[in-house]
Amino acid sequence: MQSAKRSIVRRYPVKQGLLAAAVLLAGSSLAGLDQAKAQGVVGHSPAQTARAAPGTGPGLSRLPLISESVFPLGGTTATLRGREGTSGAGPRGSSGAGGPGKSAQEEDEDIAPTAFGTFNWPYTHARVANTNIGFGSPLERVPVTGYPFRATGKLLMTFGSSTFVCSASLIKKGVLVTAAHCVFDYGKRKDGWATNVRFYPANVSNPSTTAQPYGVFTARRIYIPTVYFNGTDTCQAGAVGIVCNNDIAVIVLNARRGQYAGNIVGWYTYGWNGYSYVTSDQFGNQHVADITQLGYPVAWDNGYQMQRNNSFGKRVLGTGTNGKQLLNTQLGSAMTGGSSGGPWMVNFGTNAAITGTATAGSHPARLVVVGATSWGYVSTGPKVQGASYFGQNNEFPNADYGGRGAGNIGALVNTACTAFPAYC
């Protein structure tokens, strides 16, 4: 494996105005296919039923689940665990000054921030939109319809006759990143692909009955790792096809009326090999980062409204059934099915003007996607989820793929952008 250098790909600014639709030459497309094969990536153009409805109701989750015994927490938080909370004078949250008090009924309707689950991993979870039920005016959609939230959206797809739901985010003006299991059944080769793949940026309600703030974009081309296609990825025993090195996909979206999705809503950067992670004795020498997770879990607001979760994420190492090193990231989270494919970002938010002696610290680049929600536990008690680690691993050992990054994410993005350069 080549040197594991941490890095990111920079985000381009949001651009306004119409863009001419890209014209892709046949020779370029063939070159893209050759590139995909050489770099361990499989591409597929999903079928789109003409004017297909996205389905009714919340939809079915694609999030794969495992038991706690298959991939136990082990020492992940053992060295971080403090005392159980008491009614004494220890640290506690104050009531704040955010406005008038709420009735018990109103509080029950809100998504309350929670401290931790049975794995004692702290997190904070909340709905993104500043509203309770319904969206009577555009102001009630704030901040979900503003940047940077709106570069994340709800992903719908069809397997067989059923509609399923996931989440995804833009990392190029016309390219999404999500979980591979959202668009492909592990190891099923030519029979594993989803159809009718659709992306709704900043979704705020039921897309089958209500037009969304930024409409819908359909998938033009999907790319997944060849090992995921073949069913030969490095995976945890008892969780083959679930806890794996490369549950990652990128999707090239069709432009709409001459505009790419990112030119309307913006897009993020992406990173690899642990960008903004740090090995710290303050965290028991674990390799950790402060991570913001976005997604559309069905158990919260029927999966119609974006949820935000913040927690420390930790790189976890294991050994796959093939004897190779398994790399994942875990974090504390109350999200459930439907959150699959949603971005895990470091340094979420927008920059403030720095004055005086303040500094941004090390590795401060904003809105860097370093993972996508991949799996959770069958029990709702642990409140922990996992994601394939973006970067070099056994299957994608190179430190650079065409100047677009290292490892799995570099290979996938490079393949997509080689075949569809105008979308990048």
Where do the protein language model's features map onto the residues?
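Conserved catalytic-core segment of clan PA serine endopeptidases
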Residues: 129-150, 156-165, 171, 192-262
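C-terminal cap/linker of serine protease catalytic domains
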Residues: 366, 370, 377-424
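Gram-negative bacterial Sec-dependent N-terminal signal peptides
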Residues: 2-34
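Protease-domain processing segments flanking chymotrypsin-fold serine proteases, especially trypsin-like
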Residues: 33-170, 411-424
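Acidic glycine-/aspartate-rich tracts in secreted/extracellular proteins
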Residues: 182-184, 203-207, 255-258, 297-299, ...
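Terminal peptide-recognition signature
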Residues: 155, 168, 174, 178, ...
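Chymotrypsin/trypsin-fold serine protease catalytic domain
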Residues: 244-332
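Catalytic nucleophile loop of clan PA
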Residues: 333-372
